[in-house]
């Protein structure tokens, strides 16, 4: 399970990490927490959480059972390319939109807006994302579609008509 909030800073990272740790325990999962700007530095070491710094998402995500993230456009796209279910923790701007799209396309059991983060909500979402195979199957289906796209090629074709 990957947990990361990108460039999002938190008023109380220790409280958020405590919720993540307990949610993982309740769901019977272990997590890799990317500290990032949120300051999720891992706190007290245990067998539930490994804290990491910067790691390329395209390398890490395919190895995860599911992802928990802020639903920024880049992280959302990386999750879709990896073919992994997601639990969104949206905060602001476009994040609620991307979190709702992940639910609509069937790769997420639901979002837990960061302002409503609780152990019960996150543990339930983690359990659904990792134990209900529909999310994994749909994520893998979308992965094949996304990887077949040639976005750069399409841009190269369109550029001459724009100049």
For each feature predicted by the language model, list its residue ranges.
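Donor-nucleotide binding loops and adjacent catalytic segments primarily
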Residues: 1-66, 75
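Nucleotide-activated sugar donor-binding and catalytic core shared by glycosyltransferases
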Residues: 47-163
């Amino acid at each position: 399970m990957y947990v990361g909030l990108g460039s999002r800073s938190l008023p109380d990272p220790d409280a958020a990490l405590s919720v993540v740790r307990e949610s993982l325990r309740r769901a019977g999962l272990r997590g890799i927490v990317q500290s990032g700007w949120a300051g999720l530095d891992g706190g007290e070491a245990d067998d539930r959480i490994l804290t990491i710094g910067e790691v390329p998402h395209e390398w890490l995500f395919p190895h995860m059972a599911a992802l928990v993230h802020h639903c920024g456009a880049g992280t959302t796209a990386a999750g879709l390319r990896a073919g992994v279910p997601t639990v969104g923790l949206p905060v602001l701007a476009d994040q609620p939109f991307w979190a709702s799209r992940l639910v609509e396309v069937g790769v997420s059991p639901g979002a837990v807006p960061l302002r409503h983060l609780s152990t019960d909500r996150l543990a339930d979402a983690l359990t659904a994302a990792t134990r209900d195979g529909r999310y994994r199957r749909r994520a893998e289906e979308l992965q094949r579609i996304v990887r077949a796209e040639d976005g750069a090629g399409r841009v190269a074709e369109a550029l001459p008509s724009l100049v």
